């Protein structure tokens, strides 16, 4: 992929009419840690709709993940009135949980 020393693993999740490609890069040993912010160019995250955001926050906290803030109320866009929260997985990938209004 143009990165000397990097290796990747690829998996596909398929359903009728849909295909999701999951790519995991294993960085070369000389790669330092990078912590991106939601406002940074190239930022990526995965989002999940949930029924009870407070229950999810409690569950991920119990599992050792730390939300980046308390759930916030969404005040613009298609999710206006809902609640959202970000956390990071052990690899630093940002995960968003969103509860619809």
Indicate residue ranges for each PLM-predicted region:
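Short beta->alpha transition motifs characteristic of CBS
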Residues: 97-101
